[in-house]
């Protein structure tokens, strides 16, 4: 899977980026996603993610991760017939500030928190959600299963 990484904070080490690349490749394999798929992972600060959260979710507060799925379609969109390009899943935006805060709050490593947020965002791109309790159980169980099998433990 091709992943474009953009670190707007200039604070995410190559080791973390490599880990997230391998983790998302593993998650894609577990979910049956083609190796030709593409997505982007963007690392931002709390200020930037708050703007996105306000503009797209009407919540004027920083959040830890936001996903923008490209494969979602609604009734008003016209289907593109014959689009031969790669499967573009969408964008994952992670607040490095929130990841650091939450790694302290939950008493685990920043590596674990960034991995958790990346997988969480990735599953959203695939259509998982947690708006209903049943869906939340399914999504969170899948997250923990992927992280555990990959070896990113609490």
From Swiss-Prot:
Chief site of localization: cytoplasm
Manner of cofactor binding, per the entry note: Binds 1 zinc ion.
CC cofactor: Zn(2+)
InterPro entries (UniProt xref): MetalPrtase_cat_dom_sf_prd, YbeY, YbeY_CS
Coiled coil location: none
Intracellular or extracellular location(s): Cytoplasm
GO cellular component: cytoplasm
Keyword field contains Cell wall biogenesis/degradation: no
Function: Single strand-specific metallo-endoribonuclease involved in late-stage 70S ribosome quality control and in maturation of the 3' terminus of the 16S rRNA.
Keyword Lipoprotein: no
Family, as annotated: Belongs to the endoribonuclease YbeY family.
Protein name from the UniProt record: Endoribonuclease YbeY
PROSITE patterns in alphabetical order: UPF0054
UniProt GO molecular function: metalloendopeptidase activity; RNA endonuclease activity; zinc ion binding
Residues that, per the record, bind Zn(2+): 120, 124, 130
Source organism per UniProt: Oceanobacillus iheyensis (strain DSM 14371 / CIP 107618 / JCM 11309 / KCTC 3954 / HTE831)
GO biological process, one term: rRNA processing
Taxonomic superkingdom: Bacteria
Gene3D superfamilies, per the entry: Metalloproteases ('zincins'), catalytic domain (3.40.390.30)
EC numbers: 3.1.-.-
Record keywords, A-Z: Cytoplasm, Endonuclease, Hydrolase, Metal-binding, Nuclease, Ribosome biogenesis, rRNA processing, Zinc
């Amino acid at each position: 899977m091709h992943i474009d990484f953009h670190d707007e904070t200039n604070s995410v080490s190559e080791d973390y980026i490599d880990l997230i690349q391998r983790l998302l490749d593993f998650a894609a394999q577990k979910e049956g996603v083609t190796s030709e798929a593409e997505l982007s992972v963007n690392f931002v600060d709390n200020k930037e993610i708050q703007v996105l959260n306000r503009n797209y979710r009407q919540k004027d507060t920083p959040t830890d991760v936001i996903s923008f799925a490209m494969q979602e379609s609604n009734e008003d969109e016209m289907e593109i017939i014959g689009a031969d390009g790669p499967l573009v899943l969408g964008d994952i935006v992670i607040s490095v500030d929130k990841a650091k805060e939450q790694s302290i709050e939950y008493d685990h490593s920043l590596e674990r928190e960034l991995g958790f947020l990346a997988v969480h965002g990735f599953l959203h791109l695939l259509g998982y959600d947690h708006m209903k309790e049943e869906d939340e159980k399914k999504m969170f169980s899948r997250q923990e299963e992927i992280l555990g099998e990959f070896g990113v433990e609490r």
